[in-house]
Amino acid sequence: MSSQAASDNPFDPAMWERVPGFDDLTDITYHRHVLDGARQPTVRVAFDRPEVRNAFRPHTVDELYRVLDHARMSSDVGVILLTGNGPSPKDGGWAFCSGGDQRIRGRTGYQYASGETAETVDPARAGRLHILEVQRLIRFMPKVVICLVNGWAAGGGHSLHVTCDLTLASREHARFKQTDADVGSFDGGFGSAYLARQTGQKFAREIFFLGRAYDAQTMHQMGAVNEVVDHADLEKAGLQYAAEINGKSPQAIRMLKFAFNLIDDGLVGQQVFAGEATRLAYMTDEAVEGRDAFLEKRDPDWSRFPRYF
């Protein structure tokens, strides 16, 4: 890596520490933000295959799901920054994620393989790529997921950025391209429907039908990017967003996320929102009275609880 490339790298190792218990990761890196020696409620999850534009294989997706689920279950984490490591050791190019690795895609889907070519495919394992489960995890977790697009966001990588709550993009290197129709694939779920919500139907259809590459500023104008940031400052900007979000009420943030989701997520969204509302109700004195009355085999006394209008 050249000194210029190193100086432009938005990742500053001094601001992060590896999350313990994940030393076996090969395709993903997982860090916790550290400020003045104190662990902060922000984590960084990054694709770590820069030599192939951070394309994912089944093993990559499994690791991604594992770390995201760990962040979801960590009560001291409020924001997840999702990005890609780089630059490429081959040509110095940058990528967030370029989608599925076409070299191990078979007729039954993306194959588990010991290597990176077709002859290393394990025929005994189903060609199942769990990227849709990852999308659902991002959508339904009660944490804010911010996508930091530092280079190419293509194909399945484009759909991941769409699924995240917020997107910040590198002014110099971010490129957005929906390649599905170029490789005989299509995202008929979150990657297309939510994109149409963000950009409108006409732009979303243009992005998918034409498969053109767009820079960060164009995507910002379309409505799919929140802010365009100088490349070297991308992760600093992400941390600033995270700090502001983590400075808000955790319960309010999770309810707001599920409220925004509800209009598009049907009965599933209603169930998620209702579950959170029920959990809030359990915290009230009124709910405690109902529980205690049941356990004590008496009629509940609701007289001290006003019927608000």
UniProtKB/Swiss-Prot annotation:
Its EC number is 4.1.3.36. Substrate binds at residues 53, 98-102, 110, 152-156, 179, 185, 282, 297. Pathway: Quinol/quinone metabolism; 1,4-dihydroxy-2-naphthoate biosynthesis; 1,4-dihydroxy-2-naphthoate from chorismate: step 6/7; Quinol/quinone metabolism; menaquinone biosynthesis. The record marks Y110, D180, Y282 as: Important for catalysis. Pfam families: ECH_1. Transmembrane segments: none annotated. One of its GO terms (molecular function) is 1,4-dihydroxy-2-naphthoyl-CoA synthase activity. The keyword Lyase applies. Keywords: Lyase, Menaquinone biosynthesis. It catalyses: 2-succinylbenzoyl-CoA + H(+) = 1,4-dihydroxy-2-naphthoyl-CoA + H2O. Gene3D superfamilies: 2-enoyl-CoA Hydratase, Chain A, domain 1, Lyase 2-enoyl-coa Hydratase, Chain A, domain 2. One of its GO terms (biological process) is menaquinone biosynthetic process. PANTHER family: 1,4-DIHYDROXY-2-NAPHTHOYL-COA SYNTHASE, PEROXISOMAL, NUCLEOSIDE-DIPHOSPHATE-SUGAR EPIMERASE. HAMAP family: MenB (MF_01934). Belongs to the enoyl-CoA hydratase/isomerase family. MenB subfamily. Converts o-succinylbenzoyl-CoA (OSB-CoA) to 1,4-dihydroxy-2-naphthoyl-CoA (DHNA-CoA). This is 1,4-dihydroxy-2-naphthoyl-CoA synthase. It comes from Mycolicibacterium smegmatis (strain ATCC 700084 / mc(2)155) (Mycobacterium smegmatis).
